[in-house]
Amino acid sequence: MGKNAIVGQSGGPTSVINASLAGVFESCKSRGADIVYGMCNGVAGLLEERVVDLSTVLTDDLDIELLKRTPSSFLGSCRYKLPDWHEDEAVYKKLFAILEKLNIGYFFYIGGNDSMDTIGKLADYGARIDSDIRFMGVPKTIDNDLMVTDHTPGYGSAAKYIGVVMKEIIRDATVYGTKYVTVVEIMGRNAGWLTAAAALAKSDDCEGVDMICLPEVPFNVDHFVEKVRVMQEKKPSIVIAVSEGVKLEDGRYVCELADDVHAVDAFGHKALTGTARFLANVVARNLDTKTRCI
């Protein structure tokens, strides 16, 4: 390689994000990188020059194998939104000065869509100033919603977890003979892959969830209530998996019907909360049944 490499982790952790980190470290070292740095808390930490020589903490094969099986993000994470360079070029100048100081030739960033936004901005700015640093995004997201990526590391583990938990919820919901509707809210702003994984609960010993509501399909509250009513004519206990990001035909999030959503994160995304609670309350008001939201 001739130059050093640096790698960071960003966004929410997954069960396998550290396996990707181990892969980057091993690949860079095997291809001649003198030093492979790790950013402590992603780009936010890099701006403060908080980096670590990974060879000092990954000293042998056992360390690397343990890292692959270590949960959460080994290097720490951040949700730092990198501004556009023409709005705040000083941030870019500082970052590239730090990278030059560390003799970086290869920059890896492990994360989801927002992290790919960061790596894209850095690559564009690097091209603008004729930098020879190579910027590479390493896919990571439990949502499985990265463009041109069939399945992202992290989704499989999350999907398996959801399938297991939903089966346990179904078992719990059927212990009483009374009418009961359980609405389970699952992550997924615009992509329904995680919610769809609730279907994995179905097996020879479990009939599975009764309804799955995805953000890709326009949601109608009245139709939803009617479907629940019809289902309860056949069985008392109903379990529903609903994505946090289900939307009405006019584009509004269902959770906005309950309360105005004002809070946003660093990337400007609305804070989605209360979808299951809202739908459980609607069912309770319109049907003679107990409800709960999870």
Q: Could you tell me what each predicted segment is?
A:
Residues 1-51:
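N-terminal phosphate-binding or glycine-rich loops at protein starts, especially the Walker A/P-loop
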Residues 10-12, 39-45, 79-80, 112-113, ...:
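Short, ordered loop/turn segments at secondary-structure junctions
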Residues 3-7, 67-81, 140-150, 177-180, ...:
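Gly-rich Lys/Arg/Thr-decorated short loops/hinges at beta-loop-alpha junctions or inter-strand turns
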